[in-house]
Amino acid sequence: MAEICCVKEIQEEDVEKIRLPTRPELDIPDSDHEDPTVNEEEGCKTPTSSDHKIPEVKYTLCPPAPRKPKPNRSSGTKRKLTPVNVVNRIPIDLSREIEMFFEDLDRRIKKSRKQ
């Protein structure tokens, strides 16, 4: 345990000697004291002459916004009718047959209720 005490005494006495010195040889310039000529020579530079500028276009009116095309009326049907299909259609009047069908049903229902 005597050795541990000696180590503590050395650390407390020679704190200044043990600290690592800072490196003053590194010259880091402050951002406030930058030289503007150094920055121009080092990096890329955007051309600012009038030859390199985009010419101004003088329009008094802007063109209208593009519009969505209107759908065709015939495109709503799944099947397109050909002239042959249109010609072959024959109108049929089935109203009498429908009335007769419902009359028969009505009679059957009345008969089943009576029994």
Curated annotation (Swiss-Prot):
> Could you name the Gene Ontology cellular component terms for this entry?
nucleus
Q: Where in the cell is it found?
A: Nucleus
Looking at the record, which segments are called Disordered? 17-82
Where is it made, tissue-wise? Expressed at low levels in roots and stems.
Instruction: State where composition is biased (Basic and acidic residues).
Output: 17-36
Taking the first listed entry, what is the main subcellular location of this protein, grouped into a coarse class?
A: nucleus
Q: Which GO terms describe its biological process?
A: regulation of DNA endoreduplication
**UniProt KW Ribosomal protein keyword:** no
Output the superkingdom of the source species.
Eukaryota
Going by the UniProt record, its keywords in alphabetical order are:
Cell cycle, Nucleus, Protein kinase inhibitor
UniProt biased composition (Basic residues) = 67-81
Q: Which GO terms describe its molecular function?
A: protein kinase inhibitor activity
Q: How does it assemble?
A: Interacts with CDKA-1 and D-type cyclins.
Q: What does this protein do?
A: Probable cyclin-dependent protein kinase (CDK) inhibitor that functions as a repressor of mitosis in the endoreduplication cell cycle.
Q: Mind telling me what this protein is named? A: Cyclin-dependent protein kinase inhibitor SMR3
Q: Which organism is it from?
A: Arabidopsis thaliana
| Source lineage | Eukaryota, Viridiplantae, Streptophyta, Embryophyta, Tracheophyta
